[in-house]
Amino acid sequence: MTEKLAGSEEYYSAIKELEIPTVIFGRVTAQMEVTSEPPFSGDAGEPLGKEAVHKAENAEGYTVVADTRGTLGWREGKADGRPLLILLSERVGQNYLRYLESKGISYIATGKERIDLARAAEILYSGFGVQRLGVEGGGTVNAGFLAAGLLDEISIILAPGIDARCGMRASFDGLPPGSEPVRLKLLSAKSFDDGALWLRYSL
């Protein structure tokens, strides 16, 4: 429903203008917007228990999905015209990794209980040539990158409308209650004819 508000077109044009060839989504956002397949229902197998990297394809950009335990199903190895690359924790089942390999999907498994985003960013840079990464949500993965100190800019499209449905998450969500707020510095503000605003901040 949110995409019915003015500002959705500006959102995608802003992404294009930012020239970010690699973007990352969280599991929930990916389930809604990236994959149409049902969740993985096979035997995931024994937990991996160690760091692992599989590069199925060289590319100038990737569609990255953070899926801690390996639950999403995939039809093929591409999404949005880019090769898929899945971030997982070391708790992922070994059979799920073989499933990804059979689909021609790259993956990075790092972090004992949850994905080690800082280490994953290092591997994305050194192993996959990713120099710029756009973090497109949802709120949990956005907050994870924020907490790990991996964001240098926040880009927000403010649409002239309100979505007040129960359960709709914020752009940043999931940090402990005692976490300090993060101060931002305005870089630019752009208005559109439909009333939408594009705000860019540095951290």
Regions found by a protein language model. Give the residues of each.
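Enzymes that bind and transform nitrogen-containing heteroaromatic metabolites
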Residues: M1-L203
